[in-house]
């Protein structure tokens, strides 16, 4: 992760000499690492392994952007935190709408802030579940992205997100029916959520010409 951060800030420095981008319609692909927060049992038992998010958006001249996309995340059960040991995890798939604001502060650096709201299907699988346990919920993810341009049509980004998965995690979610594993009901009261750090690539279909080329 430290190497990735150093690499990203190198891209920012490199991008200071690049051409600016006039956002229009674009496609972004992000790959990241989720870390469970908020719900105490979820934070202790589940380990975030991956989150993936492809999306398409259109940005107006004032920077307001609208988009659609998909989100996938996987949290594995930490078998050392449950008794008896069980193996498995929770797959979450989301289709979302996105509203944000994208602004380029220099020719090579920009930011985007916004929120993704969508419909979530979560599938828990473990040794204690015969088939799978499905949960449907509302997905909400506020985020901020730091963008470094690399050409008139492309950029790289570091995104920090806070996805709320919309369900209350309990041991029953992963098939443990006869024990609270030492947690109280208050520990299950908060919605399962995460803190994510993702790296992404954006392709701008419109790009931008230099002023002397207009």
Language-model-detected regions and their locations in the chain:
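Serine/proline-rich low-complexity intrinsically disordered segments, especially terminal tails, linkers
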Residues: 6, 17-20, 46, 57, ...
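Non-catalytic effector/regulatory segments
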Residues: 25-34, 115, 156-158, 188
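Sec-dependent N-terminal signal peptides
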Residues: 3-14
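Predominantly the C-terminal beta-signal and adjacent terminal strand-loop region
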Residues: 140-214
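Outer-membrane beta-barrel translocator domains and adjoining extracellular loop/strand segments
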Residues: 40-46, 78-85, 123-131, 169-177, ...
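Short glycine/proline- and aromatic-enriched beta-strand/turn motifs that initiate or cap beta-hairpins
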Residues: 18-66, 200-214
């Amino acid at each position: 992760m430290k190497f990735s951060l150093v690499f990203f800030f190198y891209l920012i420095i490199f991008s200071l000499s690049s051409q600016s981008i006039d956002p229009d319609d674009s496609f972004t692909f992000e790959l990241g690492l989720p870390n469970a927060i908020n719900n105490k049992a979820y934070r202790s038992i589940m380990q975030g392994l991956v989150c993936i998010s492809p999306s398409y958006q259109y940005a107006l001249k004032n920077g307001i952007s609208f988009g659609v996309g998909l989100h996938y995340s996987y949290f594995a059960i930490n078998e050392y935190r449950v008794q008896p040991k069980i193996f498995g995890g929770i797959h979450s798939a989301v289709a979302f709408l996105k509203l944000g604001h994208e602004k380029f502060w220099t020719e090579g650096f920009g930011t985007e802030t916004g929120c993704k709201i969508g419909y979530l299907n979560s599938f828990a699988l473990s040794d204690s579940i015969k088939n799978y346990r499905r949960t449907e919920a509302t997905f909400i993810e506020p985020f901020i992205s730091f963008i470094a341009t690399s050409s008139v049509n492309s950029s790289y980004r570091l995104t920090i997100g806070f996805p709320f998965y919309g369900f209350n995690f309990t041991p029953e979610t992963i098939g443990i029916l006869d024990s609270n594993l030492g947690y109280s009901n208050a520990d299950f009261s908060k919605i399962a959520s995460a803190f994510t750090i993702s790296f992404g690539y954006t392709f701008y279909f419109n790009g931008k010409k230099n002023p002397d080329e207009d």
